[in-house]
Amino acid sequence: MDAIRIERLSKTFPNGRKGLEDIDLAIAPGEMVALIGASGSGKSTLLRQIASFSSSDARPSRIDIFGRSIQRDGRIARDVRRMRRDIGFVFQQFNLVNRLSVETNVLIGALARVPMWRRLAGRFSRADRALAAQALGEVGIAEHARERAANLSGGQQQRAALARALVQRARIILADEPIASLDPAASRRVMEMLRALNANHRLTVLVSLHQIDVALRFCPRVVALRAGRIVYDGPSAALTRERLHALYGDDAHLPFAVGDEVRPAAREAAGEPARRAPTAFDSAGSPDLPDSQPASPRRMLAASSMR
C-alpha cells in the first residue's frame, strides 16, 4: 500500500491558469522525496492538494492516503479532518502561534486526537506533555519549551513544527519549502532533522525545495515539476545536467558550481560511500538567525484548526 497515491490529478485556478495537469505519483511508506521546480511550477499546489486544502478539477482523479481516498473526482472526502491526522504540514512561513509557548505550540499537534471537551478547555494530559517534551528533545530545542514561540529563530521554529508533527503522530510530513527563509546553518539543521525523522520514525517525507543541491544531498528520490506537469521522477543520481537545464535554464549549473558530486543520498541508497563536493552548507558555522518575516498568529491558528 502506498503512503500517497495520485492519479490523473489536475488543478485549474479561478483565473483559468493551470496549476497542475495530469499528475500521477506514488510514494511508498518511509520514502523521503524532494519536489523541485521553478517558481510557479506547481510544487506548493501539489502539496496542498495532497492535504486537500482545496479541491481539484471536477474530472476523474483521486488522491489516496494509505489506501483511503482523501479526494476523488474533485470532491474532498467527508472525513478529511480525520484523515489529516496522518499528515503533518510544515509551511514556508513558520506555522507557530507567537504568543503561545513553544510547548503549547507543539501540544497543538495532539488536539485532533483528544476528546472534544479537552480541545475546548485546552487541557492536555500528563502523557501529552511527556510526549511533547520527548519530541522537543528529539529536535534539539527542549530548553526552549517554556519560551514564547516568537523568541525562537527561524530554524528553531521549523524544528518546533516538526516536533508538533511527532506529537500529532503524523505518518506523512509535507514540507513546503521549509528552508526558503533560513540561513545555511539553520537550513542544514532542518534538513538533517527531516532526514532523521524519516529514518528513525519511518515517516514518509515529501519536501519541496528551491535549492537543487540540497535536494540531491538529502533525498534519494526527486520529482521535478514544470508548468504543472511532472517532467522527472527518479533517483537523484540520475538527475543530469541536461534535465536540470530543461527545468532551470541557464541557472541549472548553479548547484554544481563547486563540483559535480552532490548526491550522497543517492549513493547511500545504493550502498556506496557518500562522497560529495563541499556545498554552501559546509562553510556555514553561524547560529540560527531570526527570520525577517515573523509568523502570522491568525494564519497559524487557522492552520492548526484544519488538523
UniProtKB/Swiss-Prot annotation:
NCBIfam families on file: ABC_phnC (TIGR02315)
Basic and acidic residues compositional bias, start-end: 264-275
Assigned protein family: Belongs to the ABC transporter superfamily. Phosphonates importer (TC 3.A.1.9.1) family.
UniProt-recorded name of the protein: Phosphonates import ATP-binding protein PhnC
SMART domains, sorted: AAA
Organism expressing this protein natively: Burkholderia mallei (strain ATCC 23344)
Coiled-coil ranges (or none): none
Catalysed conversion reaction: phosphonate(out) + ATP + H2O = phosphonate(in) + ADP + phosphate + H(+)
Keyword Translocase: yes
Family matches, as PANTHER family: AMINO ACID IMPORT ATP-BINDING PROTEIN, PHOSPHONATES IMPORT ATP-BINDING PROTEIN PHNC
Function: Part of the ABC transporter complex PhnCDE involved in phosphonates import. Responsible for energy coupling to the transport system.
